[in-house]
Amino acid sequence: MFVDQVNIYVKAGDGGRGQVAFRREKYVPDGGPAGGDGGHGAHVVLEVDEGLRTLMDFRYKRHFKAVQGENGMSKGMHGRKAEHLVVKVPPGTVVYDDDTDAVIADLVHHGQQAIVAKGGRGGRGNSRFATPANPAPEHAENGEPGEEKYLKLELKMLADVGLVGFPSVGKSTMLSIVSAARPKIGAYHFTTITPNIGVVETEDSRSFVMADLPGLIEGASEGVGLGHQFLRHVERTKVIVHVIDMSGMEGRDPIDDYNIINKELADYNLRLTERPQVVVANKMDMPDAEANLEAFKEAFPDLEVFAISAATRQGLRDLLFRIADLVDATPEFGLEELEEKTATPRVVYGYEAPEAGFTVSKDEDDCFVIKGPRIEKLFTMTNFMREESIKRFARTLRQMGVDEELRKMGAIDGDVVRIRDFEFEFIESSF
């Protein structure tokens, strides 16, 4: 089964918890803090494996959770950082954030890696918080939570040449003749329902990878007939070979077929029309093929057309030489040129903006709700089982201006304040 699109969930490892400990040795009174830091949590990493050809493995496992870092220990010993979780994907995999549809990575080359979820930082032990004013702190941090994301993986096959055309025009037959590939061939439409790949070698020892793509129909660019699934595999090809049934035995007009397929390519992605395209008039061994070819050339006098018969191998030698010339002369197309046309341009920056401040709002229960990445991170890394950690948490909120904002919103003693799933009372005298 060929699988070229899946949705998965990834969760990076949390950081290990920092330790509260003190140096306790004979003849060393008041040894001071000696709590170690927690280890960093594991990343979730996608890595290209050239031995894979589809995303089939993800049909059976879609949740990937990395391990957390080791907790800090006494005697100043830090926890071990966790080993990253490496998930193998086939070459040509494009990774999207399923919530924003932003491109996270384009994985092409064997061994190429991309971190799709970062592990959390390990919490600091109490030895990190010692100051002249507080030489023996009883405060340590929890580990930072690892990132979690829903991702969409799309496989856009890596082939130098893509065969496109209506169903039953002879694409599979042509691939089976010029390469060692053995696609399914039948006298009915949509015999090919998944892409097939073969390596073609010319008589002058040049080689290229050719993909036989399932037949397109009118409206493919809008998803008709699984058009989006088929067209995405054309995006990486350097050369498009447009195969046309010149016999007319299916009751179609070769001129109309040529115009319709090119319109679908342009509607799906305008950049596809910039690729070199080789027009192949197939089934020239059939009756009426010559007459149809003459009419086709009259309609497109400036178009280079290769007349062949895949069944009898007529004209294949010159065709393959021409394709090899174009493959050699055409550069690779980068990811920015592969992006599908959308209503608004998709922009992805590598720069990460600084964490924003916070917001205070009231919910339907008159509870004050505080939100903000920095505050929520502080909350998750605070150990509320220790009084000193709670005091430090409250002091940090006050320094950030949270208590002042609550007063502006009308908070008085006894009002409930919520951060994530944690609720506490606003007390003017101590907050």
UniProtKB/Swiss-Prot annotation:
Keywords linked to the UniProt accession: Cytoplasm, GTP-binding, Hydrolase, Magnesium, Metal-binding, Nucleotide-binding
Residues the entry annotates as binding Mg(2+): 172, 192
UniProt domain Obg: residue ranges: 1-158
Highest taxon in the source lineage: Bacteria
Gene Ontology biological-process annotations: ribosome biogenesis
Localization annotation: Cytoplasm
Enzyme Commission no: 3.6.5.-
GO MF: GTP binding; GTPase activity; magnesium ion binding
EC class: hydrolase
Residues annotated as signal peptide: none
Domain OCT per the UniProt entry, residue ranges: 350-428
Gene3D superfamilies listed in its UniProt record: GTP-binding protein OBG, C-terminal domain, GTP1/OBG domain, P-loop containing nucleotide triphosphate hydrolases
Main location: cytoplasm
Amino acids binding GTP: 165-172, 190-194, 212-215, 282-285, 309-311
Limits of the OBG-type G domain: 159-328
Cofactors named for this entry: Mg(2+)
Region (Disordered): 117-145
Cellular component GO terms held in the UniProt record: cytoplasm
Pfam families listed in its UniProt record: DUF1967, GTP1_OBG, MMR_HSR1
Function: An essential GTPase which binds GTP, GDP and possibly (p)ppGpp with moderate affinity, with high nucleotide exchange rates and a fairly low GTP hydrolysis rate. Plays a role in control of the cell cycle, stress response, ribosome biogenesis and in those bacteria that undergo differentiation, in morphogenesis control.
PANTHER family assigned: DEVELOPMENTALLY REGULATED GTP-BINDING PROTEIN-RELATED, MITOCHONDRIAL RIBOSOME-ASSOCIATED GTPASE 2
Family: Belongs to the TRAFAC class OBG-HflX-like GTPase superfamily. OBG GTPase family.
NCBIfam families the record matches: Obg_CgtA, Obg_CgtA_exten, PRK12296.1, PRK12297.1, PRK12299.1
Subunit architecture: Monomer.
Name of the protein in question: GTPase Obg
Annotated source species: Exiguobacterium sibiricum (strain DSM 17290 / CCUG 55495 / CIP 109462 / JCM 13490 / 255-15)
Lineage: Bacteria, Bacillati, Bacillota, Bacilli, Bacillales
Gene: obg
